[in-house]
Amino acid sequence: ISTIKNAEELDLYLQRFLETIPSHEYQLKELYEYVNVLPESYYGAGSYAKWIRVMWALKNTSNRLLIVWIAFSAKSSTFNYSDIPELCEDWDNREKRDSGVSNRSIIYWAKNDNPDGAKAVRENTIGFYVDNTINSMTASSIANPSSNTKGAGDYDLGVVLHQMFKDEYVCSDVKNGHWFRYRRHRWHEIDSGTTLRKSISTDLRELYKSRVTELQNYLVSLDPEDEKYKSVKAKIDTAMKIILRLGQTADKSNIMKEAKDLFYDEEFYDRLDSNPYLLCCKNGVID
């Protein structure tokens, strides 16, 4: 990276990084997209304090995000490609911090300073995980249309639920099922996560219904004899199975079991005790 000399080389390095991110590390691409919607006040003239905090947050998340940091810095009108070696050296010399800014900080800044851009990134991220659950069964559905498979695993659906509500809910005790919800600038305890459970049959279910509508609208434009038609039809069938599951008591209970692990924050009580008004939990605002 330190040898990059122009915009074309920088774009090549960046695209190579983004294209090689495995699906299980999609959060790195998501963070790049959040960084990309930060306004000029984070990289333009007089932005040093914010600019350097973006670097700290990226470094605290993953050393692999150096290229994202360089690309972000290059958005400045005063950026000089001859400064890249120095920026790389500065990155390498910064130690990761146990506390302070993180990936959650970047998301918070984006939401505050570019809400429309942050909303688009969030919707794109959720869409990625929704499609993962639908596409996971497509091949087997095409091969065996009469299959009784349920469509997606409980964990996979829990991941989608987590992406939708990771800034609103936290599980503080997996064993006893203690849940908190962030509302009106405070964390409130929610009995057994009942409101999140309800969202499985409402918000999460509606998300899949919307995806089915999109796929159905696309399907009518295809030739029934086309292989693409079969693929899209299989996706619709899989999504419909998921929609049915999201209204079933047993399936909702299983998804909530997976959600406990996904929403769990082992340091939640410590942070809440130290400052009940400080929003510094993994699933809350960090700043």
Model-derived features: positions:
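Modules that initiate DNA replication and primer synthesis
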Residues: S2-A143, D173-V212
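Intein modules and their embedded homing endonuclease domains
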Residues: T138-D287
